[in-house]
Amino acid sequence: MEYSEIMVRYGELSTKGKNKKDFIKQLGQNTRKALHQFDGIEVKAQHDRLHVTLNGADSTAVMDRLKGVFGIENFSPSVKVEKDIAAIKATALAMVQEIFTPGMTFKINTRRQDKQFEYDTNHLNDLLGGYILENVPGIQVKMKQPDLTLRVEVRLNGVFLSGQTIQGAGGLPVGTGGKAVMMLSGGIDSPVAAYYGMRRGVKLDMVHFFSPPYTSEQALAKAKELTARLAGYSGSIQFIQVPFTKIQETIKEKVPEGYLMTIQRRLMLRLAAAVAERRHAKGIFNGESLGQVASQTLESMAAINDVTSMPILRPLLSMDKTEIIKVAENIDTYDLSILPYEDCCTIFTPPAPKTHPDLEKSRKYEKYIDVDGLMQEALDGMIITDIHPDDNYLNQNEDVFAELL
């Protein structure tokens, strides 16, 4: 069936009181950005729902994009017909016949914005329900939890019918929850944490630490490719590449082995906080899960967090690895995350890192290096890339094959 528009329903936005207008405006902007490649599409965000007028665009492709827009609870592809009862009946029947399977139940749900229309909601429900019962053998009416709800909206500019309700991404529109930076490695966890941050409306800039020649160009490309996939939920993302080689080499040379990881993490967090301040961000997200690795014990977190007063947000804190992997698979980042390119978090990992580092010793050993000078050099060398959903940085088949040779 050729649809004329997609009717979008809000989720949490309905509870936002006086701020609801701002949330709806942001959702409208995000939806337009997500659908920018489709010529002729019109997006109109209203108080109770958002309407996407297709004007001939491919409804299936548009709906695939809408599934990734945070703030959308669900949506329905709709057909517009004239305010003529015969046309309404014919379209309603065609919709039901397209979906119907033996034993299916249904109901009609009518809303009437145009109070001048000749039939009220109850009358229209009866007319359409009776017509479908007469023409679809075996179908039954069920008012509570039917298999099919045929929605009919009588508006001023026509009648709109829909027979499907497709689940959206939920959450809040990206941009309504403020701005933060995300410490993005090439692993499984940090992209999932970024997904959860954006789902709560936070606009994220990705901070990635790059340590050539110890980390490869493929590792950098993988991080950018992960960002491109995450950009599908926000339209575009700023990717901030921070050189970290000299800092890691200096730490390895001057800091006791057991504290290498702790001091590296302290410097990473210092740099992330500095980037956040430069970009007027109010927090730092990471992919830490309590107890998962040595740097993610409470003692390690305390020793590392010591370097900044900026909020450190950990969406995955209480999640098991199996739960995180399941989400990564669902958001299409898992296959990239497991590609065998080491990031800077793994290349200088000591054989026996401190799982319970002492805070005072951490402060002491950090003074063995020129923190300010190393940080300034890294910040001066950072590179910013604007990444969009369709950008491609990694030919996976070629690179994986090359890795195996």
UniProtKB/Swiss-Prot annotation:
Residues 60-165 form the THUMP domain. It is an enzyme of class 2 (transferase). One of its GO terms (molecular function) is tRNA binding. Pfam families: ThiI, ThiI_fer, THUMP. ATP binds at M183, L184, H208, F209, R265, G287, Q296. Keywords: ATP-binding, Cytoplasm, Nucleotide-binding, RNA-binding, Thiamine biosynthesis, Transferase, tRNA-binding. NCBIfam families: tRNA uracil 4-sulfurtransferase ThiI. Catalyzes the ATP-dependent transfer of a sulfur to tRNA to produce 4-thiouridine in position 8 of tRNAs, which functions as a near-UV photosensor. Also catalyzes the transfer of sulfur to the sulfur carrier protein ThiS, forming ThiS-thiocarboxylate. This is a step in the synthesis of thiazole, in the thiamine biosynthesis pathway. The sulfur is donated as persulfide by IscS. This is Probable tRNA sulfurtransferase. The gene is thiI.
